[in-house]
């Protein structure tokens, strides 16, 4: 669509894709990265060997979701509904949904509340939750993450159905009050047919939710499989080309760049009510789960990863060099 292309050009070319953030916004990004990293470190030390499918190596996803919710709250969106698999789910529940940490840790210890509603007995990284998120600007927004099975990407049409139902029940004819956000793994988005099926429904009158924001946690590995052995396309996001969705490839070690494309993706969705993709290139610091030793199957890759600093440390050093913050903070 020429109008969409012109709109994107007008947004990107004048600023040469260079982010412009205030000192407070930069500090807030660092704060969210610290939250994300500290959660993983604490769980790693406290519950050694427990499966948690950590977000380590891809922590920038937390500031991305924070920015999405901040933008949505500022425009009085009623609710953002998230769909995601196991990777980073506990981190999102803790730092985005606001699920009580005590509840999360009790699930590691297999402590259940006998007085609560009958539970599913499902594993902790499949459970959904809802909460109210307070943004850095002081706004509140409802946010929920749908429960999901082990079947990757199966949650996609479920989230779309949840959002569509809310839009219809609340007479949200403009589809601006309820927004679906789907997080994918790079191997899963390319490998699961349900992704293409759901994309195919995105512009149909009977199924459309006014555009979905897709975020790929692209850690460049699927369990033990390299991208070259996992898909026939160059990019994991190529499936989204079937609906001509804009795709933004961004370096997960550059939080400011990811925030820039997050703003762009959100604005595009609200302007054109179509799907849009943020492809965050990152890595997986640990194995597929915490009992897996990835160096057995990917020795060269994991030698490089073990020598690579965390995104929090990279960004912290950047802000120190810019004198945006100091060591006392």
Residue positions per predicted region:
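ATP-dependent adenylate-handling ligase core
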Residues: 255
């Amino acid at each position: 669509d020429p109008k969409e292309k012109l709109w994107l050009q007008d947004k990107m070319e004048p600023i040469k894709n260079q982010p412009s953030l205030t000192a407070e916004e930069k500090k807030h990004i660092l704060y969210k990265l610290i939250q994300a990293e500290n959660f993983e470190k604490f769980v790693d030390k406290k519950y050694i060997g427990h499966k948690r499918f950590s977000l380590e190596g891809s922590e920038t996803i937390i500031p991305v979701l924070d920015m999405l919710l901040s933008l949505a709250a500022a425009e009085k969106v009623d609710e953002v509904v998230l769909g995601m698999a196991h990777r980073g789910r506990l981190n999102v529940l803790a730092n985005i949904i606001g699920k009580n940490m005590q509840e999360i840790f009790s699930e590691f210890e297999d402590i259940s509340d006998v007085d609560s509603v009958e539970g599913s007995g499902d594993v902790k990284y499949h459970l959904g939750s809802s909460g109210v998120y307070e943004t850095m600007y002081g706004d509140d927004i409802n946010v929920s993450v749908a429960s999901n099975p082990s079947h990757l990407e199966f949650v996609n049409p479920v989230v779309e159905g949840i959002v569509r139902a809310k839009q219809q029940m609340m007479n949200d004819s403009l589809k601006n009050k309820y927004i679906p956000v789907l997080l994918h793994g790079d191997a899963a988005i390319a490998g699961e047919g349900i992704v293409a099926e759901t994309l195919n429904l995105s512009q149909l009158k009977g199924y459309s939710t006014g555009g979905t924001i897709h975020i790929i946690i692209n850690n460049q590995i699927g369990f033990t499989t390299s991208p070259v052995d996992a898909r026939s396309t160059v990019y994991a996001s190529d499936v989204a080309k079937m609906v001509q969705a804009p795709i933004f490839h961004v370096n997960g070690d550059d939080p400011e760049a990811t925030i820039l494309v997050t703003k762009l993706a959100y604005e595009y969705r609200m302007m054109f009510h179509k799907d849009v993709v943020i492809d965050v290139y990152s890595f997986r610091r640990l194995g597929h789960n915490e009992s897996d030793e990835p160096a057995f199957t990917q020795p060269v890759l994991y030698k490089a990863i073990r020598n690579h600093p965390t995104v929090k440390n990279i960004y912290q050093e950047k802000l120190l060099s810019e004198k945006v913050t100091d060591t006392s903070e």
